[in-house]
């Protein structure tokens, strides 16, 4: 361990011993789709010595980021891209492929870096690619076998799910169930995998993407009349509580109420489109304070009282190069100089709020967006084959943020392959230098000078 980090950790520990304020276990998502962030090493030192954040979730397996946390007490969750899963699921070669990936991406850094979770893709079930969906659980099994074979028994395997895995319902938790098909063909076996391996079932609940002006207080943990569940005789005054208990109910109906639930990401932006109601610093603080209270304080939810949940706030920093609506770039908890965007009580007692950041910019784990596309956009060609468009979505979402096309997102409606593919193809095109090649997508994309934005759905350019 570098001497400077060791001394800072010892000093931080001494300061913490004098504090009467208990530290809550909380994690954070660390994305770096920005050009103004401090180096991963300075980020790791800051989190380990100045904050109560004790775990970090990465969206890839960038070695610079993984090695930056060596010698710190921070637990790390590392992600594989969606595109890697089919090869890992292969019955004949999947285990060898999984072991090769682990040898290349984890073994050189563990145990110096405390990697505790390996995430098999992200929100795979958002896809309609049957092959990708069928690859998910076999790939998770191969990864678990490979980790054991490589001696990395402290690393657990899971995958983050979006809330669309639940069947449409009236929002009352006791009525929740998994979607038809998934509730019989996928989740019983997946939940058994989690039970057998001791890994959590990870979900990404996002009240931000589900609220309406009339439900804002319900989403932000503010006083409201709530929603009454007649089956359990419980009154819900928090949307997050209801979402978590809906997941729990669906799991319990399959006989797996004992499996741990983890929150892969959830947060609230501080800026959004002009005129959007319910977005700002106070709203972000209210939501994140409420989520920490529910997930990390031991309060739990109405159906899961006194429980804690492994939770990762979204996100560590604003990301000024993320495509999509304004809000996508403004979920950050800290500024690039490490000062808080707002106070969540995450700084250790006595910690300076303005340590000097590294002058070196963070390496970008995602393709770096080029300057403005100069009024050009990439969209799906009229008449493009639906299978091709879905493949385009699956591919592009491995590189760009696809939350806007998820249920509740600014670009979800119209819910069509043509619209969703156009949005993510354009995001990929802009992030890769807006060259004609970046819009080709095997002949299904076309460059246009007509802005395809509509309503609240803004196409980056």
UniProtKB/Swiss-Prot annotation:
GO cellular component: plasma membrane
Gene3D superfamilies for the chain: 1.20.58.1040, Glycosidases
Nucleotidyltransferase among keywords: no
EC number: 3.2.1.39
Similarity annotation: Belongs to the glycosyl hydrolase 17 family.
Enzyme class: hydrolase
Disulphide bridges: 378-439
Organism: Triticum aestivum
The keyword Hydrolase belongs to this UniProt entry's keyword annotation: yes
Function, as annotated: Is thought to be an important plant defense-related product against fungal pathogens.
UniProt name for this protein: Glucan endo-1,3-beta-glucosidase
Region (Disordered): 350-375
Record key words, sorted: Disulfide bond, Glycosidase, Hydrolase, Plant defense, Signal
Conditions for induction: Associated with aluminum toxicity.
One Gene Ontology MF term: glucan endo-1,3-beta-D-glucosidase activity
Catalytically driven reaction(s): Hydrolysis of (1->3)-beta-D-glucosidic linkages in (1->3)-beta-D-glucans
Record PTM text: Contains two additional disulfide bonds.
Active site annotation, chain numbering: 123 (proton donor), 265 (nucleophile)
Residue stretches of biased makeup (Pro residues): 356-370
Pfam families given in the database record: Glyco_hydro_17, X8
Signal peptide: 1-23
GO process terms (BP): carbohydrate metabolic process; defense response
Cited SMART domains: X8 (SM00768)
């Amino acid at each position: 361990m570098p001497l400077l980090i060791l001394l800072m950790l010892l000093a931080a520990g001494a300061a913490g011993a004098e504090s009467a304020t208990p530290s809550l276990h909380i994690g954070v998502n660390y994305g770096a789709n920005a050009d103004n962030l401090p180096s991963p090493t300075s980020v790791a030192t800051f989190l380990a010595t100045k904050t109560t954040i004790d775990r970090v979730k990465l969206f890839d397996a960038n070695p610079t980021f993984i090695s930056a946390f060596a010698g710190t007490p921070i637990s790390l969750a590392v992600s594989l891209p969606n595109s890697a899963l089919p090869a890992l699921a292969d019955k004949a070669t999947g285990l060898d492929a999984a072991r090769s990936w682990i040898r290349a991406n984890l073994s050189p850094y563990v145990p110096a870096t405390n990697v505790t979770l390996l995430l098999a893709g992200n929100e795979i079930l958002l896809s309609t690619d049957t092959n990708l969906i069928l690859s998910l659980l076999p790939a998770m099994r191969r990864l678990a076998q490979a980790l054991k074979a490589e001696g990395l028994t402290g690393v657990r395997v899971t995958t983050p799910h979006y809330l669309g895995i639940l069947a449409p319902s009236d929002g009352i938790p006791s009525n929740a169930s998994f979607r038809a098909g998934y509730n019989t063909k996928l989740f019983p076996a997946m939940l058994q995998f989690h039970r057998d391996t001791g890994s959590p079932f990870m979900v990404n609940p996002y009240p931000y993407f589900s609220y309406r002006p009339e439900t804002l207080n319900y989403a932000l943990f503010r006083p409201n009349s709530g929603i009454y569940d007649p089956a359990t005789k419980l009154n819900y005054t928090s949307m997050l509580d209801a979402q978590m208990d809906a997941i729990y109910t669906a799991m319990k109906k399959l006989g797996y109420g004992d499996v741990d639930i983890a929150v892969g990401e959830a947060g609230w932006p501080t800026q959004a489109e002009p005129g959007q109601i319910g977005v700002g610093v106070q709203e972000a603080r209210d939501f994140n304070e409420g989520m920490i209270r529910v997930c990390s304080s031991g309060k739990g939810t109405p159906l899961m009282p006194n429980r804690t949940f492994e939770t990762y706030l979204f996100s560590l920093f604003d990301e000024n190069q993320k495509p999509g609506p304004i809000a996508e770039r403004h979920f950050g908890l800290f500024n690039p100089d490490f000062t808080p965007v707002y106070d969540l009580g995450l700084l250790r007692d006595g910690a300076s709020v303005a340590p000097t950041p590294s002058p070196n910019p963070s390496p970008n784990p995602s393709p770096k967006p080029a300057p403005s596309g100069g009024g050009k956009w990439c969209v799906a060609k009229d008449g493009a084959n639906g299978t091709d468009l879905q493949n385009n979505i699956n591919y592009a979402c491995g590189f760009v943020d696809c939350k806007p096309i998820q249920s509740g997102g600014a670009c979800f409606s119209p819910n069509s392959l043509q619209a969703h593919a156009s949005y993510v193809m354009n995001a990929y095109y802009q992030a890769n230098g807006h060259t004609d090649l970046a819009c080709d997508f095997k002949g299904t994309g076309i460059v246009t000078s007509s802005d395809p934005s509509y309503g609240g759905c803004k196409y980056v350019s």
